[in-house]
Amino acid sequence: MSYDAGKYDVAVIGAGHAGIEAALASARLGCRTVIFTINMDAVGNCPCNPSIGGTAKGHLVREVDALGGEMGKTADECTLQSRMLNLGKGPAVHSLRAQIDRNKYARVMKHKLEQCENLVMRQAEVIDIERDGENWLLTTRLGAVYTCRAVVLATGTFLGGRIFVGEVSYAGGPDGMFPATELAGSLKELGISLRRFKTGTPARVLRSSIDFTDLEVQKGDEPVTPFSFDAEMPPKNSAVCYVSWTNDRTKQVILDNIHRSPLYAGMIEGVGPRYCPSIEDKIMRFSEKPRHQLFIEPCGAETEEMYLQGMSSSLPEEVQIAFYRTIKGLEHVEIMRNAYAIEYDCCDPLQLNATLEFRDYPGLYGAGQFNGSSGYEEAAAQGFVAGANAALKVLNRDPLILDRAGSYIGTLIDDLITKGVTDPYRMMTSRSEYRLVLRQDNADERLTPIGRKLGLIDDRRWAKFEKKQAQKEAEMKRAEKTVFSPTDALNEVLVSCETSPVTTGVRLSELLRRPQVTYADLTPIDTERPDYPREIFESVETALKYEGYIKRQLQDIAEMRRLEKKLLPKEINYAEISGLRLEAQEKLNRVRPENVGQAGRISGVSPADISVLLIWLSAHNEDK
């Protein structure tokens, strides 16, 4: 028996990192929103690493925050240790990573959902989805039928989830949760193309069973940089991590039992993440390496569980115990939660458009691992965009479309919907051709005005943003106007920085353009420096040092956006365009790009094909 459970503007299926951002964005935009979770205790769960951010991922977190999302704020509230990665490289790849208290993170996120106006939470498994005119009908296992105008699918690894540990395999979700067993069939009946991916996670072990005596200690960075641009106070480092290594004995235990790995025994059909291989995969693929690094990380302030970063596995439990105990510091380790692999259903993202809406199913959106990506941060970014666009569609407002020249979020989405995926997609700085412009320190400059226009940045935060921008502009002007005389004091500073002294007056901006010189170096002579926050000076220094490169990237962006403005008709049949190669015709008909710029990024479409397309488009527009 079924019953009418009510009408909502937007429904979000899944309350992980994608679902949370989707539901909050939708509700905060004024839409009556319902979010479903199989288990209310799984809201905001971090079933893999107890951390937020990392290379390129930290960029995504700051971008979500700049738009008005929640991940950055909550990560700051739950930080145990913070580190800025890649400081030895240029500012384009500096990325923030925080070790978090995973249980606190889940509690805080759940409470934020509970307190959010316009948002209703439901513990229920959605087993059926069907179209009803302009609405969507969602049916739960208990027979509740929800009528919704838009739906966001954020199912994570729950959809058709299957656990693998050695020869043992069973239907299951992450962290011992129930899987969503019937929704995938309903989506297939609807006509959604699904595929199988897989991921894995390491064991959690008992802190008191680890010998930390000879392990390398990894401390957090000082001063701490928060994820959120709205943070009043930065988080504090309250924990450390440890580093250890595998060895020949570890390798031998794994090789002796590799036939028992479901991955190598042919039990797993799903494709795993290329950039996060299991330890047995590392041993097999990189057999020439004598050892592999692992990080021993705390899971929280009120738990004794420790996470073994870099050691995911699907080998049998007794084999896991054996190879973990070959590692320095883990000789007597006790496993609290064993490592496992999980296989799950996800969609082919080539079915989506730039709003993350399914092209052939108006009002249906995908987000996170359901779209073929991996990672909490990638999920949150997509969840925000999908949830915001679902609400904007209901409200009859213009959609939120972020391009790859303006954000890593735009790069992520463009890669998914244009290039597709053959394995779980992971964000990396190398995926952006505009990474010097898309730095994490300027995410607010790029995206907070968009969040304000959406209605997700309130007056208080907007005033704070404008103040920061005014301070940066004032400091840029001061740097150009301030001239230092060639004094002994100045030249002593320059010599200490291993750069040439000066014989004539020199502008502050010119000194900061030198690679060897920083604001900190110039403190003794820059006596008129205003009392601005540290990030103002860091931002100005980066802008000055990389001015030439940034100008060139801005020129590239202008050209890309010129091509993005050349829209392609939705009804176009590329097979009928004379001059296009067969491969280009097939790829263009499959991806259905919205503009010439996107068409040029499709694998298999050459510059010559784009020239043909531009000629055809010009003639087509003239005929009109």
Go through each PLM region and give its residues.
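Beta1/beta-strand and adjacent pyrophosphate-binding region of the FAD-binding site
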Residues: 4-18
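Conserved N-terminal/central alpha/beta ligand/cofactor-binding core
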Residues: 7, 24-132, 142, 150, ...
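Conserved Rossmann-like nucleotide-cofactor binding loop
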Residues: 18, 41, 594
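An anion/pyrophosphate-binding glycine-rich loop and adjacent beta-alpha core
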Residues: 39-41, 84, 184-321, 418-491, ...
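A glycine-rich dinucleotide-binding beta-alpha-beta segment and adjacent secondary-structure elements
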Residues: 307-373, 401-414, 533-587, 592
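Glycine-rich phosphate/pyrophosphate-binding beta-alpha loops
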Residues: 369-377, 433-435
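Internal hydrophobic alpha-helix adjacent to the cofactor/substrate pocket in enzyme cavities
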Residues: 379-400
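Extended, charge-enriched "interface" segments that sit outside catalytic cores
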Residues: 431, 437-439, 443, 448-453, ...
